[in-house]
Amino acid sequence: MNKTKRKQQSNKVALKRDYKSDSDSDGDADALSTNDGFVEPEQKPIISKPPQKKKKYKDNETNKVKPPTIEEMKELRDTRNLFHSNLFKLQVKEMLEELHLKSKYTDYIDKWLENFTTFTEQLEDGLMDRCQLEVPLHLHKKTINFIFSKPEQPPQLIGAASQGTLLQPNFIVDIALEMPKKCFEKDDYLNLIYDQKRALYLAYVTDKMKSSSIYREDQFAYNYYANNPLKPVLELTPFAKIGKHLKFRLFITAPVETFRLGRFVPSNNNIRPILFNDEWNLEEQPLPSTQHYNANVLFDLTLSANQSLLNKSFQGRRNFQDGLLLLKVWLRQRQLDVGFSGFSSYILAMYIVHLNQQRVLHQSSSSYQVARTVWNQLANSDWTKGISLAQQATQEQLSFVVGFYDVCFMDITGHYNLCSNVPLAVYKRVREEAKLAVDLLNDMKINSFSYIFMQKCPLYTRVDNILKITKATSVQQLLLLQNHTEMKYDYANYGYPQMLKTLTDLLEKGLAQRIHGIIPLETAVSPWSVDSKAPIIGQSIQLGLILNPEHAYEVLDRGPASQDDDEGAAEFRSFWGDKSNLRRFQDGSICEAVVWAAVKDSPAKKRLIVKDICLHLLEHHFKLDKDDVQFIANELDIVYKLSPWFKVNKLMDKTKMKEELDQNTDSEALTPNVIRCYDELSRQLHGLNDLPLEIVSISGVSPIFRYCESQPVLPQTRLLANRRIHTNHVLRVVIQLGQSGKWPNELAALRALKTAFLIEIGEKLKEQCHLNWSLTSEGLLIIKRGYCFLIELAHSKESALLKQQINERGITTYVDNPQSRDLERRHYILPKVSGALHSLHQSHSAYGPTVLIAKQWLASQLIDDGLWSPMATELLVAYLYQQRHAPFITAAPQTGFIRLLQLMSLSDWQGELFLLNFNNSWEDQQIADLEHSFRSDRESYPPLALATSYDQQHAGRLWTTDETPNRLVLNHVSKLARHALELIETNLMSKSLQFLRPAQLFRASNEGYDLVIQLKPELLANSLNYDMGSPFVDFGQPNFNLPLAGQDRLAHIVAHLRSAYSDYAAFFYKPHGGKELAIMWKPPNVFAPKAFKVNELQASTPCVGNRNQVQVSRDTLLEDFKLLLKDFYARICTTEDLKREQKQHSKPKRYFQINPKQFENESMKPKKQIHKPTKAKTKTINTKKLKGKKILLKSKPIKALV
């Protein structure tokens, strides 16, 4: 589809949404309206009119505006009743116009079919001994004598080509060629003989086509239709240019009278034990039914009758065809039509026919009504009870068939189940997606077009965990140990559906309420050459688990009481094995139970309970080891774990902590400790005596109070002898005092009084609670149990004074400015948003960890806080958890991160406003007004526009600015997200047993940078997170020196570099533990010679030979960079130099393995400035000589922590 064209068309039209109720939102109501505004084109005869005399135009009030015609009024009425807005209608109409098949394709298809019909008429009967091609069948074969007989019926178009609903971008035209009845004998329906003859017939026709001059230059390949090894088809790609987008697929079928259809009822057996050399005692056990194999044969036998029904229903009805096109786009975007168990568009086409038969759809229903009615009916359907296209079908017949299949939808003959291979979980998934589509259409607050039709929703983004079994030996072992021998006959010994059924039944029983469903994740089989043997497929399986957050992480499975239900207890023990134990519960009952984790375990460990259950069941029932199975659940959680370099036992020994810390802890598990400490501090603040004013509210506004701090926060704050506080994290708290009319009306005086209040609070805390404190320019620093809190005092008068301006007439006015907005955000709006995000995490426990992974990913890509606001990440993830763009909100942080990557890769930053309506406090009209303001005055909003319901008049402009992030950074992040998604999808859907390593995602590329400034590692503390390494140099020994509270010198210097030199270079660094600063020069035209101007001489030098011109010198810029970096600077080099050094040196060159002298020798300073102290001078330091100089404090207590 041409997205650019659609966007341009949408932008050209000035549109307003009509927020009136949709009276036809449900099933039967859809059927009552007969038009949605789409006027189907009709050929009208041209009627010549006699020339008329020109009439003089009278300029009066009645002739200025022409009244609308009946057609226009009808179109407006239908637009109001059926669509959100005229925009949605135009988008659907334009998409359908793009989807319609061009005449060049239809002409080519008709000509090709005509030539192929002529070709089949020229075929001659004969033996198969002259066929040189491989037979496309790889199952149990029986030696048979087969004589080819030419087709008696001409080939016919089937499927989408016959219905006029071929879908872009690659058109697949299905052709059916019917074998004559004389090719078969009476008992050929038994033991796969029919399937072998069908494959032989296909090989013979293919061989003759290859030798024909008509098709000699075309490409021939075999493939399996719907990944079914019993359904080989020929794929022919024309040699002509049209073959880039068009291919033909040849099916071989049989006439309906070949076999009596009654032989293929679900209860019959058509595969005998002799085929597999099995022994079977018919007196002890009857032959198993082969309902799925029978349906496989019935597909061919009933194809002609079903195709006739489709042709009758669709041909000449553009509304049905377009409605099916809309449904096919929706289904394709969700990948629900792929593989052996896929819900194909063929089923949707038949369902449209069924609804038409039931008079739910009318012949005059428009294309939009067709799609909407199908979704609405599908969302409220129950195919487990059976539906049928056959007029004579009775409920008794359906009840009989239902017992053999998960889902039942009988065809026109009443014998073939169209959903014979569709598992119940896939049908439920389609039903949930249909319900979501209806909900999106009914939501007047959003334009649902992009969510329904445009955005890809791969199945792996809809599941929380993925189970993969890809080893051939493991698959064979599983099939050997499964106890359902009848399945081998039912599926003709095809392994994949047997594994799918076996594993699904086992895991659904074991996981019970912990999951919403188990979905197979399939990929289409690749075609193979007609000269090669058919490949063996079905030797691997991938299952996606959709977790139920309410029960997924329960630590115990309780079984029946042994004294009341002996058989149930025995069955429970047999199912769970040695994991089951007798336990006494608080109610006094003694029951069998399985315990998976302790109640006090970390959330990350509890998220592995489902994994532990699945692996245990596979080991207990099928003897599969952990190495034989890959369970993808929490591979990315490692990025916010505590670094193994940091030893918590030393911290606990030094600080004598009461709480025990686990070395395997992470940021999420450490957060409750901080919140408990904060709650205790809040109680102490409220309990302070003799304060001039009462403290009325206390709000924690740091990310950790909403579970969004990606760095582990440990109780390691230290107060040194000089009253300076050193810590890694400063936790911000905003307090408000009671009302008083004595606050001054001048800003300086008010701030001085605030400082006095903070000093008073600090002294009271010291006196009454024995807490150390220190005053800074930002607020009051309090140390409590090893954590450092920064208390800020909020007063509404301060914001008003910041807005106060006196104009030329002496009149006082109040105008918003950046300082006042920032103060309002920090003191009044952020506490509310922080509380809302905290509540969101309490409702959806995966929210916080998803933010942690996202923040770590952005930081690893050298996107620091100066380029991308951390609050933007938190709000974007919250937007995902608030919007119902998926049937289920994910319970896995890893899946939440994948969905965020998808949002970043697909979002139109320029045209989308991200609204977060916390607690539904925004009225519909307020949202409409904000969206109208955003569309009409887009330039006044930042490139990334985020708005919450607490932002008041600053909505959309509060959390991001024009530079954080700017458009270049947004585009860069979108590209990074697309690349990350490609890596994830490739690894998830591959047959490999190994998932991608986190370092593949969480380490930036070192390509594209012009220079790298290496910084002295001993002056920069490492991140407490698990370090994935630097993109430029190798690992080295880290340091964990504590910085001065609230100071990030490197971030401050980089901010200064950007403010001064952003016109000449872009600067990138890793904000957590980064030891390098990467530089990208701006385009060469920035450094081109320019005219001499006094105010544009920054880093400029005169041009050689032309004193009237100057140009910016990169060497001068580098000297400025080194001057700003001062003590941090070690050396400057290119990425090529670093790569060369890594190859030449075995030792890493990042941390303390390098002698500090080496940094000096390799720096770009003049040699005369290099000091080389002797060993005698390095043993002691004369502190008297250092008095009065700025030095880096290195206290032994801080250093001794690690």
Swiss-Prot record:
Tagged with keyword NADP: no
Alphabetized UniProt keyword annotations: Chromosome, Nucleus, RNA-binding
Primary location recorded for the protein, binned into one broad class: nucleus
Quaternary state and interactors: Part of the small subunit (SSU) processome, composed of more than 70 proteins and the RNA chaperone small nucleolar RNA (snoRNA) U3.
Lineage of source species: Eukaryota, Metazoa, Ecdysozoa, Arthropoda, Hexapoda
A GO term, aspect molecular function: RNA binding
Protein name as annotated: Nucleolar protein 6
Gene designation per UniProt: Mat89Ba
GO BP terms, alphabetized: ribosomal small subunit biogenesis; rRNA processing; tRNA export from nucleus
Compartments where found: Nucleus, Nucleolus; Chromosome
Chain residue ranges for the region called Disordered: 1-64
Family: Belongs to the NRAP family.
